[in-house]
C-alpha cells in the first residue's frame, strides 16, 4: 500500500486496455469503401482461397475485412459495413463484412444461421 506522500509524488495510473479492433473507434460497425477485393491463402495446416476485401473506412483507416459465406457480389468501390471479429487462420484480418447490409448482398440459398449472412426466410 502506497503512502499519501508517494501518491502525491506519483499518482496511480489507470490501466490501459488495448483493443483488438482499433479501426472501429468503439463503434459496433463502420462503413467503408472497398479498394481491393481478392482471395488469399490461410496459415499452415489449412488450405483454401479465402475471400477478403481491403476497405477504406469513413474515419480514414484502411483495413482488411473477411467476406464470409458462399459467393459474394463485392467489387472495387462497393460500399460495405464491417464489424469486429478476426479470422484465426488469416494473419492481419481482424474484421468481418456484414452480409446483407449496404452494397453487400446476403447469401442466397442459405437455410440455417441466416441472420449471420443476411438471408431472408425461405417461403416454406
From Swiss-Prot:
Family matches, as NCBIfam families: rpsL_bact (TIGR00981)
Gene Ontology CC entries for this record: small ribosomal subunit
Modified residues (3-methylthioaspartic acid): 89
Recorded GO MF terms: rRNA binding; structural constituent of ribosome; tRNA binding
Family: Belongs to the universal ribosomal protein uS12 family.
Swiss-Prot/TrEMBL GO biological process terms: translation
The protein's name: Small ribosomal subunit protein uS12
The protein's role, per its UniProt record: With S4 and S5 plays an important role in translational accuracy. Interacts with and stabilizes bases of the 16S rRNA that are involved in tRNA selection in the A site and with the mRNA backbone. Located at the interface of the 30S and 50S subunits, it traverses the body of the 30S subunit contacting proteins on the other side and probably holding the rRNA structure together. The combined cluster of proteins S8, S12 and S17 appears to hold together the shoulder and platform of the 30S subunit.
Gene3D superfamilies: Nucleic acid-binding proteins (2.40.50.140)
SUPFAM superfamilies, A to Z: Nucleic acid-binding proteins (SSF50249)
Subunit structure: Part of the 30S ribosomal subunit. Contacts proteins S8 and S17. May interact with IF1 in the 30S initiation complex.
Alphabetic keyword roster: Methylation, Ribonucleoprotein, Ribosomal protein, RNA-binding, rRNA-binding, tRNA-binding
Amino acid at each position: 500500500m502506497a503512502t499519501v506522500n508517494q501518491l502525491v509524488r506519483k499518482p496511480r495510473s489507470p490501466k490501459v486496455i488495448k483493443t483488438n479492433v482499433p479501426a472501429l473507434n468503439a463503434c459496433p460497425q463502420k462503413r467503408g469503401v472497398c479498394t481491393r477485393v481478392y482471395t488469399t491463402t490461410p496459415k499452415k495446416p489449412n488450405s483454401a482461397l479465402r475471400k477478403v476485401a481491403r476497405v477504406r473506412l469513413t474515419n480514414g483507416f484502411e483495413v482488411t475485412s473477411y467476406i464470409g459465406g458462399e459467393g459474394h457480389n463485392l467489387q472495387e468501390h462497393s460500399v460495405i459495413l464491417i464489424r469486429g471479429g478476426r479470422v484465426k487462420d488469416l494473419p492481419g484480418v481482424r474484421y468481418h463484412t456484414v452480409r446483407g447490409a449496404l452494397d453487400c448482398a446476403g447469401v442466397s440459398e442459405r437455410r440455417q444461421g441466416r441472420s449471420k449472412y443476411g438471408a431472408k426466410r425461405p417461403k416454406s
